[in-house]
């Protein structure tokens, strides 16, 4: 069967534009030519692809199947032409990517200005959220995702690993005490993510490991959200304990607003990946952005261990007691100021 690729591309454009007239205007062709090309395509395939009415067009079942495959072909042709052009002029064009809100705000957004300074011809469209856009269907060029990849058609490049730990503000510890073992968590005020819920019994658990074994400990959250960033205000105000990524908590630890609790226990470690559709040409703009992130992201988990209460206790034993007591007094005062400001 002979095949005219132009007929296929015209069909994709008609579906994209929603009418023959709009497609003709977009392509710079007469409407009669566009209509004839689609008819010739239907004749060659032996199937009607479009429902035609005076006001609109719609896809038949055969048309929907054909369009799904042809849309990918059209997009890959466009990307191939763009890639060849960028070999001459450098990466350029819109780069659409998605990233979870907490990581996007804390780690990705502060780097975008630097990236644009290096690649001024790349325009960035960042989608913050936990919903997964369709990379295969072209809703985004790239996704920055945490955790395992559910779709075998996606490939990933690892940007780093995220370790989760339990954090509390000085004001919380002053008011409610500090848990010394995860068994005590069920008696403490906690802030949890929806993913911590057990779907079978509708109870919440935190998975924690002491290095030799992983156990699930029940918690009774007073607040639940789908992103840890939504719980930051509550943990800073001393309302509860939060199990979150060390890199998300790092700015607050550095400023003394929170500290790690339950020394020796850590939550799950998950990968942070740059994800894109497999089997597709990786455009120079995507490659440039991923290479930049690999170079600039620094998930320094060792820093968090330096803030571990057990390590601070060891420092006191080695003669740093007066300095540490003074620091903790300042942290308690800061915690009170945060709480008073939030409840004023």
UniProtKB/Swiss-Prot annotation:
Record keywords: DNA-binding, Transcription, Transcription regulation, Virulence
One of its Pfam families is LysR_substrate
| InterPro entries named in the record | LysR_subst-bd, Tscrpt_reg_HTH_LysR, WH-like_DNA-bd_sf, WH_DNA-bd_sf
A GO molecular function assigned to this protein is: sequence-specific DNA binding
Location of the HTH lysR-type domain: 3-60
GO annotation (BP), single: DNA-templated transcription
Observed phenotype of the null mutant: Disruption of the gene alters the expression of about forty genes associated with diverse functions, including extracellular enzyme production, attachment, biofilm formation and flagellar biosynthesis. The mutant shows reduced virulence, but the effect is less pronounced than that of XC_3703 mutation.
Role summary: Transcriptional regulator that directly or indirectly regulates the expression of virulence-related genes, including flhB, aaeA, fliL and flgG. Binds to the promoter of the target genes only in the presence of XC_3703.
Question: Which family, according to UniProt?
Answer: Belongs to the LysR transcriptional regulatory family.
Q: What is this protein called?
A: HTH-type transcriptional regulator XC_2801
What species is given as this protein's source? Answer: Xanthomonas campestris pv. campestris (strain 8004)
